[in-house]
């Protein structure tokens, strides 16, 4: 039997927002499995699906570069925000973003590409910057989107400089119409993606494993009602329809005009663009997403020093 430690309970509390005893029981019921325990708490109505740890804390910058039909978004991490605000670091992130345009957009290909400012590879240039600045840094993630005919619209939320910030979005729009009008609606949709973080463009593109996990949680929640299985099945189907509406971009209420869905807003924009519009891809990078920064307990450190 898996031992349930205080650290495990603490982690589950941070991830779920549930109380200590509920977390302890959830872990015991699920053999210490963290994700299964979160689902168990959700099924009991104790935790919310979108509750996050709140400890996402890597520093650095998101950088975006675009050539119209191709755009790339990169994440370069540093240890402190002080370095992220440094002009040299910002220039490097901007340079890496521009280099990434001529690669296939993967981290490996970008690291291997030549960084114009140094004549060395991006990877070696980052190592040189580490030696100069005295702080560890790394190219962590990158995504590139392309269209043959259309635009890849970009948006950086709360930009600290042109193309640099903490959150970057790309939206690829395929259309033979007016590119200026296309970019206008594309940027608005990129702002929408920044705000809502959709899981996919269309409902059928939502990851099957994610959808199945939601379905299982909804089944358990519905069974708590004590209703017959045929009623539960209808309840689950209704909740799944609502889930897909909430997480698929095209069915979401458009943040700029909530009276329209994103799909309806696109249809309206086609009047100005002069041709049909199809969203072929989206990318959204939030700085530090998925990284936990180690928190130091100052009181514990002092106590440890005092004990020798």
Curated annotation (Swiss-Prot):
Keyword Protease found: no
Protein name, as recorded: Elongation factor Ts
PANTHER family (UniProt xref): ELONGATION FACTOR TS, ELONGATION FACTOR TS, MITOCHONDRIAL
Main localization (coarse): cytoplasm
Region Involved in Mg(2+) ion dislocation from EF-Tu, annotated ranges: 80-83
Compartments, as annotated in UniProt: Cytoplasm
Cysteines engaged in disulfide bonds, as pairs: none
UniProt similarity note: Belongs to the EF-Ts family.
Alphabetic keyword roster: Cytoplasm, Elongation factor, Protein biosynthesis
Organism field: Allorhizobium ampelinum (strain ATCC BAA-846 / DSM 112012 / S4) (Agrobacterium vitis (strain S4))
HAMAP family from the UniProt entry: EF_Ts
Cellular component terms (Gene Ontology): cytoplasm
Gene: tsf
Record GO terms (molecular function): translation elongation factor activity
């Amino acid at each position: 039997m898996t031992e349930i430690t205080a650290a495990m309970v603490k982690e589950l509390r941070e991830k779920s927002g549930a109380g200590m005893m509920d977390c302890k029981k959830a872990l015991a019921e699920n053999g210490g499995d963290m994700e299964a325990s979160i689902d168990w708490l959700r099924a009991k109505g104790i935790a919310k699906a979108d509750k996050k740890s709140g400890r996402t804390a890597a520093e650095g910058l998101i950088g975006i570069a675009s050539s119209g039909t191709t755009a790339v978004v990169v994440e370069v991490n540093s240890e402190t925000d002080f370095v992220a605000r440094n002009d040299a670091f910002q220039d490097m992130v901007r340079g890496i973003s521009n280099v990434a345009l001529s690669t296939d957009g993967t981290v490996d290909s970008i690291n291997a590409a030549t960084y114009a400012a140094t004549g060395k590879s991006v990877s070696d240039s980052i190592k040189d910057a580490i030696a100069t600045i005295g702080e560890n840094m790394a190219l962590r993630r990158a995504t590139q989107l392309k269209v043959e005919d259309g635009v890849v619209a970009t948006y950086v939320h709360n930009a600290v400089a042109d193309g640099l910030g903490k959150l970057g979005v790309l939206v690829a729009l395929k259309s033979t119409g007016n590119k200026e009008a296309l970019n206008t609606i594309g940027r608005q949709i990129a702002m929408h993606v920044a705000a809502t973080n959709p899981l996919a463009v269309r409902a059928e593109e939502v990851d099957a494993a994610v959808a199945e996990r939601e379905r299982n949680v909804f089944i358990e929640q519905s069974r708590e009602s004590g209703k017959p299985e045929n009623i539960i099945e209808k309840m689950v189907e209704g909740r799944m329809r609502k889930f897909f509406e909430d997480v698929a971009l095209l069915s979401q209420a458009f943040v700029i005009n909530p009276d329209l869905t994103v799909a309806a807003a696109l249809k309206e924009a086609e009047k100005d663009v002069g041709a049909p519009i199809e969203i072929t891809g989206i990318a959204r990078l939030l700085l530090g997403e998925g990284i936990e920064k180690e928190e130091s307990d100052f009181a514990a450190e002092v106590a440890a020093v005092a004990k020798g």
